[in-house]
């Protein structure tokens, strides 16, 4: 184990941070590329498929990220144990995290496959409901491997080993892209399964990622000291409670955050299929860009958590400043690109020469410009929350997120979308108002937590 208790300057902290963040960003971007290709191929299958597939993808992502949030306690707790030299505890945390995954996946699969009533109630078109249902019935089988992979990923990055994640995700992404093309359009001897074929390729990629990382962790000798999978069948209620004590609020916050995006998608669907299609195009583009600050938030959780294990407060503040600053810088650059090339980006998804796509194109351009300004807020709130997770401060941020996302963001989205001429653009503006509130709240909370924890002889949440 490297001596992480040494003093780091800002430049040195940035180097250590980027050693984690760059491979993780590569992995997240590769994974987002899968969603990007899915969306492009859905567009090739028609505007109805694009709208339905986009809505179904948002639903699956909401469930998946809720599960990922609930097991997110693995990463900060393992990072703290790694920083404190508690080798045995690392394996215990990882094993119990996998038990949580199993207990979450079964009810999650049942919910995903029984959402017809919700879609009818929200005013979705019949075609959208039928196509979404066929996609979700397959994607439900990818829920367990997706969350289990996130659990193992949380362990491995907390041990400062991010490169295997990137290689595994890139390989699975290439498989998914080829599978999409073969199964979606009937190439290379496969039947043309349309949107169902895209779902089959996606769940196959989730299983490949999970099993590949599992094999790596079993095979890699430096990891054997942690006994990661010994006595896997033993439930440890005390450790389960610790994981859920930290991860539970993160999971609830994920429900609220992704629930905001999902509800916004329902709002857009109620405004019309072309508007929903435009929303899906911009959402997918933003999601690809969001993968970088998301990776940075994971790295921030690990760096802050490792310093937290050593009780080094100046280094914790440095890690926070580095992660938030780099995330804001990246999203600012990405926002400029969206402002400069909105039509070209939308043209990757939709045929700009098809008159049937005219309304979707016009709405998409207006939304893209709004997203360009909102990206910085998205990156800021995500990395600031990652810093708080590294300090194992998750319950108050959950409350702050509830107020910001639903009390402010959702209300603003509804009012601006349905009671002003802004329509779909208003829904996006309202969402970013919520993210702005979350950003301010999380930064305030970080300052407050730092003052409080530094005054304690042994800081613990």
Swiss-Prot record:
The chain crosses the membrane at residues 17-37, 51-71, 98-118, 138-158, 165-185, 198-218, 243-263, 275-295, 320-340, 360-380, 398-418, 424-444. GO terms for biological process: monoatomic ion transport. The gene is norM. It is a multi-pass membrane protein. One of its GO terms (molecular function) is xenobiotic transmembrane transporter activity. GO terms for cellular component: plasma membrane. Belongs to the multi antimicrobial extrusion (MATE) (TC 2.A.66.1) family. It is found in: Cell inner membrane. Keywords: Antiport, Cell inner membrane, Cell membrane, Ion transport, Membrane, Transmembrane, Transmembrane helix, Transport. This is Probable multidrug resistance protein NorM. It comes from Synechocystis sp. (strain ATCC 27184 / PCC 6803 / Kazusa). NCBIfam families: matE. Multidrug efflux pump. Its main location: membrane.
């Amino acid at each position: 184990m490297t001596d992480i208790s040494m003093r780091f300057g800002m430049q040195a902290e940035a180097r250590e941070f980027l050693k984690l963040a760059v491979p993780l960003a590569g992995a997240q971007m590769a994974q987002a590329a899968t969603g990007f290709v899915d969306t492009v191929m859905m567009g090739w299958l028609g505007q109805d498929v694009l709208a339905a597939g986009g809505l179904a993808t948002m639903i699956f992502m909401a469930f998946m990220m809720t599960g990922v949030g609930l097991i997110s306690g693995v990463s900060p707790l393992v990072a703290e144990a790694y920083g404190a030299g508690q080798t045995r505890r690392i394996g215990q945390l990882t094993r119990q995290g996998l038990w949580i995954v199993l207990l979450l996946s079964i009810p999650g699969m049942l919910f995903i496959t029984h959402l017809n009533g919700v879609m009818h109630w929200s005013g979705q078109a019949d075609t959208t409901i039928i196509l979404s249902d066929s996609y979700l019935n397959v994607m439900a089988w990818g829920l367990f491997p997706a969350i289990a992979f996130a659990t193992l990923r949380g362990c491995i990055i907390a041990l400062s080993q991010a490169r295997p994640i990137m290689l595994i995700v890139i390989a699975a992404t290439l498989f998914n892209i080829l599978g999409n093309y073969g199964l979606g359009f009937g190439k290379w001897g496969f039947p043309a399964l349309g949107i169902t074929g895209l779902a089959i390729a996606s769940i196959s990629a989730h299983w490949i990622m999970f099993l590949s990382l599992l094999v790596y962790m079993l095979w890699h000798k430096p990891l054997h000291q942690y006994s990661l999978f010994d006595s896997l069948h033993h439930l440890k209620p005390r450790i389960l409670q610790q994981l859920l004590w930290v991860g539970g609020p993160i999971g609830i916050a994920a429900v609220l955050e992704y629930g905001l995006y999902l509800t916004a998608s329902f709002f857009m669907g109620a405004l019309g299929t072309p508007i929903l299609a435009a929303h899906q195009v911009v959402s997918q583009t933003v999601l690809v860009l969001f993968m970088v600050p998301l990776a940075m938030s994971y790295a921030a959780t690990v760096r802050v958590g490792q310093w937290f294990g050593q009780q080094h407060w100046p280094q914790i503040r440095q890690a926070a400043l580095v992660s938030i600053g780099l995330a804001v810088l990246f999203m600012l650059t990405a926002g400029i690109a969206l402002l400069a090339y909105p039509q070209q980006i939308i043209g990757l998804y939709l045929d700009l020469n098809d008159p049937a796509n005219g309304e979707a194109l016009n709405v998409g351009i207006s939304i893209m410009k709004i997203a360009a300004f909102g990206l910085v807020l998205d990156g800021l709130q995500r990395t600031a929350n990652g810093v708080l997770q590294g300090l194992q401060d998750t319950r108050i941020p959950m409350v702050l997120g509830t107020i910001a996302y639903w009390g402010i963001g959702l209300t603003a989205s509804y009012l601006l979308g349905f009671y002003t001429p802004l329509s779909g653009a208003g829904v996006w503006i309202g969402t970013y108002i919520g993210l702005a509130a979350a950003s301010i709240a999380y930064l305030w909370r970080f300052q407050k937590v730092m003052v409080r924890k530094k005054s304690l002889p042994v800081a613990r949440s």
